[in-house]
Amino acid sequence: MARKKHRKLFPTLASETNKTLDCSNGVCDPICPYNCYPEPDYYTISPQLPPWSSSPQPSPCPSPSISAVYLPSQDSSSSLDAISIITITGAVLAILLTGFFLVAKFFSDSVNRVNQGTYQSDNEDNDTVMEEEFQDREQVDHPIWLIRTTGLQQSIINSITICNYKRGDGLIERTDCPVCLNEFEEDESLRLLPKCNHAFHISCIDTWLSSHTNCPLCRAGIAMISVTTPRYSGPVEVTPGGSGSHLENDGVDEEDHGEIENRVDSDFKESDDSDIRIEIYRFDSDGDGSETETKERVRVLKECMDPNGGDSVNSLSHTKTHVESVDFPGKSCENQSEEFTRHNGEDEASCSEENGGGSNQLRRSCDSGELNGETTGDEGKSQSDISSSTLKTNGSSSSVSCFNKNKSSVFPL
């Protein structure tokens, strides 16, 4: 069988058959078989394997080049090194920041403790100084703003004069209100205090006077209250009986003794010897806060002698004594008491009984003398005139011979 001759695809290269190339280095040109071998198809077409042969052996793979193996391993190691460096750096920074915050907190706490100790020591020193000042000045424990004050009544506040402000008239010296410090306007209604002539806004001074009784600028008093001192000039009715006794005053003489307060108290008791003592206490308070106490005592002596032994004391169960106006200054009381003791024996009462025409009427009259005592003291001369009124008794219809002696006297303590 004739062998077919293939047509050459590269005629230009086929003419150069005498040129051989060395293909032993493993690098062959695609046209090498046609140039190097006379039958290139024999080398390019793989021969068919025989049927008895086993599985085909794999062709050995060419060894990888150095660049293909070395370059990927270098990239992975560099990435691992970068990650580890970043991790270590972050951990170091975290440790440093934590230590810095701990140190800063420790120093801040120590500084606060030092400042607190210094502040407490300063406060203790200030408290000690203030306590020493309070002890030196003898101040009270309670602050002044805790003291409750009582002001004037609204009727008294409304009675204070209201005037219109005229600039330059000379009535009001200030041009502003001392309470609110606002300027007075022309023809504005102001309240003018009576004593000091200080002017205020009506709302300002009314609020002040509701809790105070003086001027807020000069502390002068606002209201002048005149109080009269009672003087006992009428008859005083005395009924023996111990605790059941009572005192009646029919007439009162008025005399101005104080500006703020005048109080009169009375007390009386019956002693064992039938002497009734009436004590009158009078308290006069001046405007400056001082108080003067005056004590007066009225003693009524009852003595009745019944030679027949009859019960004539019952007829004197009701005795009325008239006490005239008696005034004893404070420092002359002791002298008056001594004067009364000295003249007590000289004061006698005469009692006479007259029965006219055998009538059953009994008339007793008692004339008492007058006790005039003149005493001299440090403050001056004091004189007391004491007179007793007629002793009126209601006896029985039968004639009873009774000698009664009644002495009425007033002397101070």
UniProtKB/Swiss-Prot annotation:
InterPro entries: ATL1/ATL16-like, Znf_RING, Znf_RING/FYVE/PHD. GO terms for cellular component: membrane. It holds the Pfam family zf-RING_2. GO terms for molecular function: transferase activity; zinc ion binding. Residues 402-413 have a biased composition (Polar residues). It is a single-pass membrane protein. Its EC number is 2.3.2.27. The chain crosses the membrane at residues 83-103. Keywords: Membrane, Metal-binding, Transferase, Transmembrane, Transmembrane helix, Ubl conjugation pathway, Zinc, Zinc-finger. It is found in: Membrane. Residues 387-401 have a biased composition (Low complexity). It catalyses: S-ubiquitinyl-[E2 ubiquitin-conjugating enzyme]-L-cysteine + [acceptor protein]-L-lysine = [E2 ubiquitin-conjugating enzyme]-L-cysteine + N(6)-ubiquitinyl-[acceptor protein]-L-lysine. A zinc finger (RING-type) spans 177-219. Residues 238-258, 321-413 are annotated as: Disordered. Its main location: membrane. Pathway: Protein modification; protein ubiquitination. One of its GO terms (biological process) is protein ubiquitination. Coiled coil: none annotated. Belongs to the RING-type zinc finger family. ATL subfamily. The RING-type zinc finger domain mediates binding to an E2 ubiquitin-conjugating enzyme. This is RING-H2 finger protein ATL54. It comes from Arabidopsis thaliana (Mouse-ear cress). The lineage of its organism: Eukaryota, Viridiplantae, Streptophyta, Embryophyta, Tracheophyta.
